[in-house]
Amino acid sequence: MRITALAGGVGGARFLRGLLAAAPEAAVTVIGNVGDDMTMHGLRICPDLDTVMYTLGGGIHEGQGWGRVDETFGVADELKAYGVGPDWFTLGDKDIATHLVRTQMMGAGYPLSAVTEALCTRWELPVRLLPSTDERVETHVVIDDPEAPGGRRAVHFQEYWVRMHAPDARAIVSVGVEGAKPAPGVLEAIAEADVIVLPPSNPVVSIGTILDIPGIRQAVADAPAPVVGVGSTHGTSSGSTRRTSDRSQVTSPPARSVMVTVSPLNATRDADITRPLERTTRSARAGAARASPARTASATSRVGKVISLYFGSTNAWNTLTPNSLKS
């Protein structure tokens, strides 16, 4: 059986580990989110891809769900002594080695997909891990800021989540997505899958940002395979965690799930999921305050398919309303 999963970080990685235990003979391809990617201290960091890699490769810090087990922080301590920031995102020494290799290879001209394949070779992953795109696409969040022009400004999702602890969001911005295309192998993995799985990753900033890459949403909609979403049940999940400057972890509230039965593509009323949060894909230079409303990302499917989408209960996306499932 060929299984293709669209996955974010912690939730997706843990689901994949269970999937492999349940279906050890399956050929699994994972299409990973790159929206969390960023450059810090000159290093290209891919949090979600690395979390999947470390988890399935046996190197993850199990208690946190991210970062390396038995990590040390000598470099971070030295940077702090020099007064070099930012101090809200701590990189471990082992983790830095991964980022050094990635940055060096990308600087030499290798695309992210080739770099990811090379990094995964070391970990002997039981899956094929693909970035959703080789292009640089980052998720930014528009927040209120009385001191900014127009009263709003956009920050990188990692800063929004880790440093600012997820204040009310006004828009989700996929910066650079207009010029992006699926990484090699992504569309083929979707078209050739026997099952397409949406793990319990955040539907807005993990699954949604993958579907935002031009061509991926339509490929999922056109795929002959069933599309199955797996979500947490309200009150049973401990929520997701985020790193802090003091290396402790902050846990978000429990999650809830919404089950949606998808109608035929040619029905008079397909199904989609909307939310009271603007979503926009535009360049970084556009005015953040002019972000236009758009529907949240979700795949269109055929009759008889059931999708249970995971909805995190953090501020901006905890009031999603199930209506229909049409992009």
What kind of feature is each model-predicted range?
Residues 11-16, 205-210:
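Short glycine/serine/threonine-rich phosphate/pyrophosphate-binding segments
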Residues 193:
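An anion/phosphate-binding loop that grips the pyrophosphate of nucleotide cofactors and donors
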Residues 1-3:
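Extreme N-terminal starter segment of soluble prokaryotic enzymes
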Residues 24-26, 223-227:
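A short helix->loop->beta-strand "cap" motif at the edges of active sites that frequently abuts
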Residues 33-174:
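Electropositive, gly/pro-rich neighborhoods at or near active sites that engage anionic ligands
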Residues 240-257, 261-269, 274-275, 279-302, ...:
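Low-acidity, Ser/Thr- and Arg-rich intrinsically disordered low-complexity segments
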Residues 210-217:
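Charged helix-capping and loop-helix junction motifs
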Residues 15-26:
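A short, Lys/Arg-enriched amphipathic alpha-helix followed by its capping loop at the start of a domain
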